[in-house]
């Protein structure tokens, strides 16, 4: 099956080094970017636990991280278009 990703989604994915081809299922691309986000959030939590960042800055850093992954807030059905 061939998928036609929206340009806005491709742009966001490419910011994270993800360039899905026409045969890449949206579920696979979504899972990959979600795994990257989870890796970063876990690393941030570990920095908090080890004292590398103060607790008072943790929430703002989590918010900044979420802002770097807006594509995850889009439903997967929106990632592709049907022409």
Regions inferred by a protein language model and the residue ranges of each:
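Charged, low-complexity interaction regions
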Residues: 23, 48-55
């Amino acid at each position: 099956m061939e998928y036609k990703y929206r340009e806005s989604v491709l742009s966001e994915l490419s910011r994270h080094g993800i360039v899905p081809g026409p045969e890449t299922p949206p579920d696979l691309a979504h899972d990959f970017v979600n795994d990257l986000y989870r890796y970063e959030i876990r690393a941030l939590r570990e920095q908090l636990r080890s004292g590398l960042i103060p607790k008072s800055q943790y929430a703002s850093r989590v918010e900044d991280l979420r802002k770097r992954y807006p594509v995850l807030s889009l439903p997967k059905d929106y990632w592709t278009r049907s022409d």
